[in-house]
């Protein structure tokens, strides 16, 4: 089974212009996957200006017309940034990107998905293990997130829902600057975290560093319906049939009748195996 993540999307592209030299630091590369016969070009958004320069001097040879795919970034793409990218590359036919906040006829949103497999919280074997367990849904709403990921947005969420749905994990999260502390924390907690999601009908998923959040897709893979606030990308995902509840403000959560019947109505016959690149093209 393929999990949606930045690495998965990159490997759909014949020309891949970004890699990682270690767990944290990305690097511009010029890699042509000869096994893929397509005009898809993958680039981390932060390197698009550099790519334009390299293309002009001939260091990178882009197709005359191509489809761009950007991922592995927290940049939210609004109208101004979209125009900037098309000014750099007027020969783009289609562009697929995460964190898309503006409607454009040539640009389509793709999910952040789960963490990349180079990260401990993107360990796909761990996901498959929990997905293979039979989890009876015994919890209505699961609330567990690191407020420090996006303090303003996440405190807003917490302040508006905590009377009814308090934060379940009040343990201190590790120092984000330490990869080892992060990995130790994930290795000791993620299985139970995923099990709690799987046992819950609904999972609260406030925005992350970018508007999309790994938790949204962790919930979907655990067959829990994510509750998110509205932005362009999630509206499009919902239109594709991906089960989620979209609200405009977290104060609305208290008015939702979050029942097993609502879960069944929204989830319907959705199959997580349909989550692949073709769904978003």
Regions found by a protein language model. Name each.
Residues 250-261:
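A cross-kingdom feature marking charged/low-complexity
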Residues 1-214, 225-243, 260-281:
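Nucleotide-sugar donor-binding catalytic core of glycosyltransferases
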Residues 244-250:
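Conserved acidic donor-binding segment of nucleotide-sugar-dependent glycosyltransferases
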Residues 220:
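Short alpha-helix at the nucleotide-sugar/activated-sugar donor binding site of glycosyltransferases
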């Amino acid at each position: 089974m393929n999990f949606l993540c930045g690495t998965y999307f990159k490997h759909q592209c014949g020309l891949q212009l970004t890699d990682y030299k270690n767990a944290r630091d990305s690097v511009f590369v010029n890699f042509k996957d000869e096994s893929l016969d397509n005009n898809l070009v993958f680039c981390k958004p932060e390197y698009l200006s550099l790519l334009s320069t390299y293309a002009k001097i001939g260091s990178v040879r882009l197709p005359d017309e191509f489809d761009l795919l950007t991922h592995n970034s927290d940049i939210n793409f609004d109208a101004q940034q979209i125009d900037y990218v098309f000014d750099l590359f007027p020969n783009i036919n289609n562009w697929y990107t995460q964190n898309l906040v503006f409607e454009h006829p040539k640009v389509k949103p793709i999910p952040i998905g789960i963490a990349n497999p180079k990260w401990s919280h993107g360990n796909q074997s761990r996901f498959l293990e929990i997905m293979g367990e039979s989890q009876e849904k015994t919890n209505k709403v699961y609330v567990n997130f690191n407020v420090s990921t996006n303090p303003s947005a996440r405190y807003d969420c917490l302040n508006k829902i905590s009377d009814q749905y308090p934060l379940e994990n009040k343990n201190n999260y590790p120092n984000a600057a330490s990869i080892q502390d992060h990995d130790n924390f994930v290795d000791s907690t993620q299985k139970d975290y995923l099990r709690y999601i799987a046992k819950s009908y609904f999972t609260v998923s406030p925005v992350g560093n970018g508007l999309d959040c790994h938790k949204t897709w962790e919930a979907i893979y655990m067959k829990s319906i994510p509750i998110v606030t509205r932005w362009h990308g999630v509206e499009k995902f919902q239109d594709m049939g991906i089960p989620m509840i979209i609200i405009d403000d977290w104060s609305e959560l208290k008015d939702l009748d979050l029942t097993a019947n609502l879960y069944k109505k929204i989830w319907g016959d959705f199959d997580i195996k349909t989550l692949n690149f073709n769904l978003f093209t």
